[in-house]
């Protein structure tokens, strides 16, 4: 297969980045693979996030992360991609010990990836998790008749209901 160069913002180019970003043996192990896809500032932000104590706490416990699939939406005009990603991980009970490990634990995330073009190549300038709400579900929930009624504690009679 032909390697995407990044001169165009395409699904295959975004997927190449996602593969580099989500495939790793352990925290930080994949930096050299995703660095070529990012601006220096975005890369530094990612490294800083990996160094945070809350993130470091999982090092050695959440391992073997692999990209499984990605749905990629590209907005060429704003140089942005919205990606819905499925990936698996192995979760260890003891650091670096695969005994009793939970393997292939499926996780999902949605990211907005902003790109800028530098020297003829699209680079990730910002990576942020986002939440996409299913408006059909939200509007169905909103149409429920008791949505805005006062909540009651157990054993209390709700005076609004007959």
Would you name each region that the model predicts?
Residues 1, 31, 35-36, 62-63, ...:
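Generic detector of bulky aromatic hydrophobic side chains
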Residues 1-18, 139-159:
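N-terminal, intrinsically disordered, polar/charged segments of Gram-positive cell-envelope systems
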Residues 2-64, 68:
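Core segments of small alpha/beta cavity-forming domains
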Residues 4-8, 76-77, 102:
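Short, solvent-exposed beta-strand/turn "edge" segments of beta-rich domains on protein surfaces
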Residues 68-76:
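Short amphipathic beta-strand and strand-loop transition segments with alternating hydrophobic
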Residues 75-79, 122, 156-161:
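Intrinsically disordered, low-complexity segments of exported/surface proteins
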């Amino acid at each position: 297969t032909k390697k995407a160069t990044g001169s165009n913002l395409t699904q295959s180019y975004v997927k190449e980045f996602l593969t580099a970003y989500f495939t790793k043996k352990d925290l930080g192990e994949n930096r050299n693979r995703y660095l070529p896809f990012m601006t220096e500032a975005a890369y530094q932000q990612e490294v800083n996030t990996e160094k945070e104590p809350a993130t470091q706490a999982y090092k050695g416990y959440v391992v073997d992360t692999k990209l499984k699939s990605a749905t990629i939406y590209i907005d060429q005009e704003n140089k942005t991609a919205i990606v819905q990603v499925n990936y698996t991980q192995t979760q260890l009970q003891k650091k670096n010990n695969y005994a009793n490990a939970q393997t292939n634990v499926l996780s999902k995330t949605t990211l907005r990836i902003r790109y800028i073009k530098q020297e003829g190549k699209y680079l990730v300038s910002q990576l942020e998790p986002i939440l996409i709400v299913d408006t059909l579900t939200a509007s169905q929930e909103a149409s429920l008749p008791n949505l805005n009624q006062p909540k009651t504690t157990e054993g209390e009679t709700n005076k609004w209901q007959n």
